[in-house]
């Protein structure tokens, strides 16, 4: 990022009015002061860095609101990487190294899930690691999505058209069924689903917890894998899609200019197939559902595609919540010191 791009800030403070953290945490100076205003000071003297920048959850709602298109969240995250003195803790390492924890946990998922669900264990995690006992930890799937995909791979190759599915950590370790369901939908559109030869976590948990060098290495690995073919790349996670497209060059200085436009949300890709004349045999679903728009989907401007797909389901009544951050923000809401703000 150009170091002077923050000069486009017109000091209107609209970013601060939309920031979910500054509303409830008086210790956070807000995106304008933490971002453009603070950057002017930091460029003069790095000692002026404010550790309160750690309260930024990188939801990007400040960037959505900014009339001058200042990359406020990027400025804050890059400042944390460059000037931050606070070293990551063991708790931060556990929460952010999702591939490691998932690989260790999925073979023993029933035992791990039962153990971490016990109140005494949760209180012990709170006392020892500051992982708040009031939070319910995500459950692991028994076996990974990539392992389950092996049984589907031969059939996928039979389709004349193909897409690559960047499944991300949640599908791979926590909810493999979501990946299987996506494959069924994509297959119904006459397209096969391939996986990257080697996929690592997109890097967002590492960035959020201060492991920038590790995040950069994983980004480089993912970009190299994506360059092995020229197929469209779809993701069910808006954060994964956003990170692959925008955070790699903006925060990690990993060039993805040759493949950025190939990456999109699965719902956007599906909507485009339907708009081109393909059809899906949708069964009636007489339910009323409430939908919350993820922050990073809002940032990409792609919320409409998901909502329009849901509205195509016969019998489904859709109510869209006001667009607000959910408060969890990846690993942020699991930390004891952030619980009250997260709530």
Tell where the protein language model's regions lie, with residue ranges:
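Intrinsic structural disorder
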Residues: 1, 9, 19, 32, ...
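Secondary-structure capping and boundary motifs in well-ordered enzyme cores
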Residues: 11, 45-51, 55-58, 162, ...
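Iron-sulfur cluster-binding electron-transfer modules in prokaryotic oxidoreductases
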Residues: 72-343
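Short, intrinsically disordered, charge-biased short linear motifs at domain edges
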Residues: 1-6, 42-53, 187-189, 312-315
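Non-heme iron-sulfur electron-transfer modules
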Residues: 21-51, 69-93, 340
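Cysteine-centered iron-sulfur cluster-binding motifs in ferredoxin-type domains/subunits
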Residues: 3-22, 48-70, 101-102, 295-296, ...
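Short N-terminal binding/cap micro-motifs at the start of the first secondary-structure element
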Residues: 16-18, 25-27, 174
